[in-house]
Amino acid sequence: MTFYLFGIRSFPKLWKSNPYLGLGPGHSYVSLFLSDSCGIRSQQRLFSLKTMSPQNTKATNLIAKARYLRKEEGSNKQVSSVPHFFSAGAAKKRSQMNPQSKDHALPSVRNTIQLPTQPLNSEEWDKLKADFKGKTSFERFIISQMAHSHSSVDVAKSLLAWVAAKNNGIVSYDLLVGYLYLCVFHMQTSEVIDVFEIMKTRYKTLEPGGYSLLIQGLIHSDRWRESLLLLEDIKKVITPSKKNYNDCIQGALLHQDINTAWNLYQELLGHDFVPMLETLKAFFDFGKDIKDDNYSNKLLDILSYLRNNQLYPGESFAHSIKTWFESVPGKQWKGQFTTVQKSGQCLGCGKTIESIQLSPEEYEFLKGRIMRDVIDGGDQYKKTTPQELKRFENFVKSCPPFDIVIDGLNVAKMFPKARESQVLLNVVSQLAKQNLRLLVLGRKHMLRQSFQWRKDEMAEVQKQASCFFADNISKDDPFLLYATLHSGNHCRFITKDLMRDHKACLPDAKTQRLFFKWQQGHQLAIINGFPGSKLTFQHILSYDTVVQTTGDSWHIPYDEDVVERYSYEVPTKWLCLHQKT
């Protein structure tokens, strides 16, 4: 029998009166096709589908001397081509230079079924199901793959009509939500409203994914305020997600309800959520048509929020910020996209970007927090004993302040083909020639004669640097942080470790930002060299990559669309805004 369903309004005729159909709200299967809608991107698909057609001067000088290889060695070009350790995209490039073996990756599960591109009748759906060889439910598999492939609403509608005809009018909740997802994706607002009416009749409550889809679909209609009621329904069970707030804010701005949008934004912040950048962008997009000082001040508060939480707008958001500034009447703002020189000077306006170095007050604050929260209170991040840590503290206090602290085991493994003790000795020897006070942190096994560790080379290391060898079960990071901070703001450290665990151990955004700022200003990276050759250290950034203003100028670092930036990296592109004089 040929069965096409051209209107969702005819669905109730196919269903029985029981309000709880199929699996019911909350079934975990719904998450399979809600990933995009709820702000979670799926990077892997289980099936492959085919579509059918119908300060210390010595330490400072070291940095200056080690920024580049000697000109006579002809290596300036080589050094300049290496991305900075903390620059956006640097980790991606390092991973490409050192690809990991993929020989043991599990093959993805594949199914040869082809998704239809046109609505099917009952006989055609019957045949497609008969050809299906998967172990899961055919209907669930099809609707999930339709969602992933963003199939047309009409094709999904024919699936639901076929299911209803085969099951005495019963359509399971997960199939209905899958259909709703496609309606939302294709912005079929009238269909969303029809599904909304059915769900109100059939279900007393929904699971969060269903609510989220309805909110997202309703905000584009003249019934957008009902999305606010759905938000209240979510609050009765759980805290709404920042995606829920984002959609409601977008709906309020779309329909010119500014007060509701700002109230929702404050409510979002009250939950300690970090707003989605598209939420903040929406305020700037709306603001270019608003000539109101109060609204303008709130947008400037958003920029301060970006600064305080070390957030970076994307390229599109940066364009929205630029457009808004240039639209403010009487202020004569002019924006341009630019970069910052290594000296910290903006190439756009010539102003100097804020220094990466912490103020004395910031340094003492951070030092106290790290000592308390990471060294003394961070047991979950270290493997050592209180006795050994105390022994180390006494050792450090008995020594003059160090200029450089070296993670010995980490540095020794930087060149895998070389003997580890030889690598460490080479690094220590070259630094010792600069008359720097060095501390090498290591493990006791490094002192035992072995293929990787020669006693004579380690004895030479101990002649040129102070050394502390911890138990083999200990972790070096707490020792490295303690020694570096105790030595003073001039002290640098060498390790490839990015210290993300320690940053996460800190209690608030302010302390985490200060830690990352301190790390960028003190961590030395070896970017060139091998045993017996001259080492090259990457320059330490002189400026802080953070949103900043001088009153008559703003400098806003932003993410390029084409660059993949890891959380411990910073953008290299800037939006420069200044007032014409």
Curated annotation (Swiss-Prot):
Q: Which CDD domains match?
A: PIN_PRORP
Q: Which reaction does it catalyse?
A: Endonucleolytic cleavage of RNA, removing 5'-extranucleotides from tRNA precursor
| Chain sites annotated for binding Mg(2+) 1 | D407, D476
* Occurrences of domain PRORP (ranges): 340-576
What is recorded about the domains? Displays a distorted and non-productive active site that probably switches to a fully productive state only upon association with TRMT10C/MRPP1, HSD17B10/MRPP2 and pre-tRNA substrate.
Q: Please state which protein family the record places this protein in.
A: Belongs to the PPR family. P subfamily.
PANTHER family, sorted: MITOCHONDRIAL RIBONUCLEASE P CATALYTIC SUBUNIT (PTHR13547:SF1), PTHR13547
Give the quaternary structure: Catalytic component of mitochondrial ribonuclease P, a complex composed of TRMT10C/MRPP1, HSD17B10/MRPP2 and PRORP/MRPP3.
This chain belongs to which protein, by name? Mitochondrial ribonuclease P catalytic subunit
**Which organism's genome codes for this protein?**
Macaca fascicularis
